[in-house]
Regions:
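Long, charge-patterned amphipathic interaction tracts in eukaryotic proteins
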Residues: 68-136
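Intrinsic-disorder-associated interaction segments
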Residues: 27, 38-41, 63, 67, ...
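Short, surface-exposed, charged/polar-biased interaction segments
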Residues: 55, 59, 69, 91, ...
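Glycine-rich, aromatic-bearing surface loops/beta-hairpins
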Residues: 127, 131-174
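N-terminal interaction modules that seed assembly of large macromolecular complexes
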Residues: 27-91
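Compositionally biased, low-complexity repeat tracts
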Residues: 9-12, 18-20, 116, 124-125, ...
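N-terminal amphipathic/basic-hydrophobic helices that include classical n-h-c signal peptides
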Residues: 1-27
């Protein structure tokens, strides 16, 4: 399965006509080191896929195939410099405003803190367009899997990543 994902992902990257996301995508992926930064926070690609599948609604695609397709979409999205930079922003904000200031007024993700949702919605829309904003709301409210364990910025950023990718998957199934 790993070999299949690797081959499929290489094919997706090779067939992409966007010069920023196509051939140069390796540069952006390494520039932000976003996958590695997320993993340091305990957020693995498999955990993201598992959370995505927590609210997956079948559109005629078997769960195993959907899981595989989502993994490919997530990996591809992480190579987009816009998505990666927004995720990086969430990582840094989480470190600065949540981890370093455990006793601050945002420790419990208060209602007046909106920037975390804005980041999540921006990631979702960047990947999946307007439909992804509604999908983001589902994941933000239910917080399946790893989302329930993350702080206020990363839970929304990862929910946005999931929402964008699931929205694209659903659109392709219709």
């Amino acid at each position: 399965m790993i070999i299949f994902l690797s081959i499929a992902f290489e094919h997706i990257g090779a067939s992409c006509h966007n010069p920023i996301i196509g051939e140069g995508s390796h540069y952006f992926s390494k520039m932000f080191e976003i996958e590695e930064r997320l993993e340091k926070k305990g957020i693995t690609i498999d955990a993201i896929v598992e959370a995505a599948m927590g609210l997956y609604v079948s559109h005629g695609m078997p769960d195993e195939q959907a899981s595989m397709n989502l993994k490919i979409k997530i990996l591809k999205s992480l190579k987009d410099p816009n998505v990666s930079s927004l995720l990086l922003g969430a990582v840094l904000l989480e470190e600065e405003l949540y981890e370093k200031r455990k006793n601050s007024e945002i420790a419990e993700d208060p209602v007046f803190l909106l920037s975390d949702e804005i980041i999540g919605m921006a990631i979702a829309e960047c990947i999946g367009g307007t439909y992804a904003r509604f999908e983001f709301t589902r994941y933000d409210q239910k917080k399946p899997g790893i989302l329930a364990t993350l702080g206020p910025f990363l839970d929304d950023a990862v929910a946005g990543l999931i929402a964008g990718c699931t929205s694209r998957l659903y659109s392709e199934c219709v």
